[in-house]
Amino acid sequence: MAKKKKKIKLNANISRRDFIGGTLVGVGAALLYSYKDVINTVSKDPHGVINDSWTGYGGVGDYAISNGNVASTRDAAHLIRNGFTNKMRADAEETGEEYDMVIIGGGFSGIGAAYEFYKKYGNTKKCLILENHPVFGGEAKQNEFEVDGYKLYGPQGSNDFGPPLKDSGGLIANIYRDTGLPFDYDFVKQDPKKTKVRAPLENYYGVFWEEERYDTGYFMGKDSKTPWVINPRADKLARLPWSDKFKAELNRAFDDKKDYYTGADLDQWLDSMSYKDLLEKVMGFSSEVTEYFDPILAISMGGVGADVYSGYAAKLLEMPGTQARYAYDKSKNDHDVGAYSFPGGNAGIFRHIIKYLIPKSIKGGKSFEEILFNPINFSALDNTENPICMRLNATAIDVSHEGLAKNADYVNVCYHIDGKIKKIKTKTVVMGIGGWVAQNIVSDIPDSIKTAYSQFHHSPILVVNVAVRNWRFLDKLGISSGRWFKGFGRFFSIRRPMITGELTQPFDPEKPAVITFYVPFNNPGYPVKVQGVLGRAELLRKSYAQYEQEIVEQMTEMFAEYGFNAERDIAGIVLNRWGHAYISPQPGFHFGINGEEAPKEVVRKGFGRIQFGHSELSGYMSHTLALIEGSRAAIDVMKHIN
């Protein structure tokens, strides 16, 4: 009989004490009660918040009640998915409000549409953004911790950015100029007396693309002859306990110098097959190589296995064999590589844009540090004096033209807020949300768009931020990033922090830090739709406590031999569950099949006074493409505004 695992107990001061005013906020609190009441109660507790037994500990600060898909937004989305909103719509209260544009979704897509609206109309027209979460930003939110006198931040979802060139044109560069986002960034200088560990400036490059630049470890299991192999690519994987054949295949994949197709239609050719078929049928690799790359695809942008992922989509990730080679250049320093991370991920970018559109949305002035760290002024977001307003905890349940789309002068929007259904009118709508919701709430959606949306598939990710009181155990190991092949999760990383004034985070093994874990839920061997469904079921079924225990056990297994003690060293764990984190483009998604129009192009057409603008339409859900898609949708639909 197997020995029963001893449950590791965390210090009660880590999270169990963190109730709101001594009372646990129940599932759906943000929908059932006044948002103002929730915010006021949160602000009373400096230690942090446990929102409910499923959402769990949220950290401290404004984002503490909005870590990932919290229970309230999950439940509201499932009501929409399951078709329970018809009666709610019939009971809607007409508010008498009328807008020139209503944007559904307060993430990067929505804010990209709002930016375009404001650039054209300034203070002369009215726009309302409806956001279903308790805090704006979509996946561009942050987790905050207070540990031993230090304020620490980690990305909830959207992370990793590269600033445009100062003299460049285009939407993204214009946003930087208008909002005051810097074009140049500095990072904490490494003190070799404190640590010699090389850490990335963001959370991804240490686990594949720039693995040779940074100190990365492969955990082979605590019972392995060599549990950790440090920097395995330094000697072409020689120390890994894998077969010589497999290691030779991986080295050939990493080298990636051969062209496998010379036609002018390379992208279409790649989109005609899965990445697995490219690796195995075209490049001649074994299935072991595919299995090696599967979790890399899953955490970076795909969410699914290579067996259902378009080869062209893999090219967008610069994966081997796609002729978009990512070459490690040792002559560059890591700053020159140009992949950075704000303390709270791309929340730093979003906060600059919202401050530009609604100047009082973040308290204080316009300095870089103030915008990054000052409290959100929630009362300023939905102020009728603003040309652009944002209404939080407002879940859209129905969007439809007033009459036939081709003749309509208005669109009616019904939404749920504070336990009531409200109805407003608008001249135009931008659906800045994913198709898994959009197709269910736009009730007069044409069959052509509905059919196209049936070819959009999405997959989940779990991002876990673990605040530790020190990272001596990583320093002793000599790593900043890690990868493992069995157990909970697959990757973790710490970053060398960005310099952000007085709140610059330390880079010292003796001081606190945030370790970010990426947990994929890919299920190779199943159809693309099924992989997403299975992944979401796994993501959603466990309580916070169950995940907490798995994380602690995994960290203990990997790090206990190097001085790690969970009860002593962990200061907080925040889960960020994203049920539809990624579009998972199957072969044909980008360029169509058998001469048919690609599904994303069908949706981009919109209809009547409603346009769709979400990063999924690019087949690659990044913050820049979200801004671009939202901008495009707004420009298209603004032709209906007089």
Task: Write out the residue ranges for each language-model feature.
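Conserved flavin/dinucleotide-binding core of flavoenzymes
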Residues: 44-90, 212, 416-417, 467, ...
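N-terminal glycine-rich phosphate/pyrophosphate-binding loop and immediately adjacent elements
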Residues: 58, 75, 89-267
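Active-site/ligand-binding neighborhood in enzyme catalytic cores
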Residues: 251-394, 404-408
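N-terminal export leaders
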Residues: 15-32
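Active-site rim elements
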Residues: 155-166, 261-268, 335-344, 450-455, ...
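Conserved beta-strand->loop/alpha-helix structural units within folded catalytic cores of enzymes
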Residues: 100-115, 130-133, 428-435, 465, ...
